[in-house]
Amino acid sequence: MEGVFTYLGGILGEDSHSAVLIAHLLLVAVIVIMIAKMATKSFRAVPNGTQNVMEAYLGGVVAMGKDVIGEELARKYLPLVAAVGLFIFVSNVIGIIPGFESPTSNINVTLPLALMVFVYYNYEGIKKHGVVHYFAHFAGPVKLLAPLMFPIEIVSHLSRIISLSFRLFGNIKGDDLFLWVLLMLVPFVAPLPAYLLLTFSALLQTFVFMILIYVYLAGAVAIDEEHEKAPAPAIDTMGAV
């Protein structure tokens, strides 16, 4: 955030905001890699310590995705969703520590994340169904409404980039500003309850981003299932007209 002291900003210079952002991104990357290394350093049949936490996390991600896309596909996309979730959570939480900045409070971080998800789920949909079949489902099951539905679906999919990036950016930016103001008014002791609230908010925003990845992937790869669920009587009626 502009004008807010950070330890890395003190080292690199507060004016070089891009360098400070990159430094915080590298710090988050190092933390994520360290967590992964600690969890995989020595596998045990009965997990303990970091391995236990990581296995619980991965199991929770699969359980979350299973309700959306099925267990097989939830496991297939587990590496992407779990990695993105861990990165976002660490990025969110690090800003709660005074003197550090959440990389996810910057649109230059959340927008590339949203673009990555957008490109990936469309790629998966095209890979499974082919270009023609994939984009044909944008027109919907009712052919007469295709000229109306196709542009609406295109706009709807493009708007996901904005909703994913700005939801995460706006919430984390607001949390950081809230904590900053609170620390200015009543430093150290009084903000302690706020830390719990902000940690919950960081967890919630991570969950929302992860579940939306599964939702978008489900919509891209489960086209046939969607069409099968379309009400047949409505299609027959329109065809008769």
Swiss-Prot record:
GO cellular component: plasma membrane; proton-transporting ATP synthase complex
Stored Gene3D superfamilies: ATP synthase, F0 complex, subunit A
Entry membrane topology: Multi-pass membrane protein
Keyword Transport: yes
Single Gene Ontology MF annotation: proton-transporting ATP synthase activity, rotational mechanism
Main location: membrane
InterPro entries the record matches: ATP_syn_F0_a_bact/chloroplast (IPR045082), ATP_synth_F0_asu (IPR000568), ATP_synth_F0_asu_AS (IPR023011), F0_ATP_A_sf (IPR035908)
PROSITE patterns recorded: ATPASE_A (PS00449)
Pfam family, any one: ATP-synt_A
Keyword annotations of the record: ATP synthesis, Cell inner membrane, Cell membrane, CF(0), Hydrogen ion transport, Ion transport, Membrane, Transmembrane, Transmembrane helix, Transport
Residues passing through the membrane, by range: 19-39, 80-100, 106-126, 135-155, 177-197, 203-223
Compartments reported by the entry: Cell inner membrane
GO biological process: proton motive force-driven plasma membrane ATP synthesis
Quaternary structure, from the entry: F-type ATPases have 2 components, CF(1) - the catalytic core - and CF(0) - the membrane proton channel. CF(1) has five subunits: alpha(3), beta(3), gamma(1), delta(1), epsilon(1). CF(0) has three main subunits: a(1), b(2) and c(9-12). The alpha and beta chains form an alternating ring which encloses part of the gamma chain. CF(1) is attached to CF(0) by a central stalk formed by the gamma and epsilon chains, while a peripheral stalk is formed by the delta and b chains.
Chain's role: Key component of the proton channel; it plays a direct role in the translocation of protons across the membrane.
Family the entry assigns: Belongs to the ATPase A chain family.
Descriptive protein name: ATP synthase subunit a
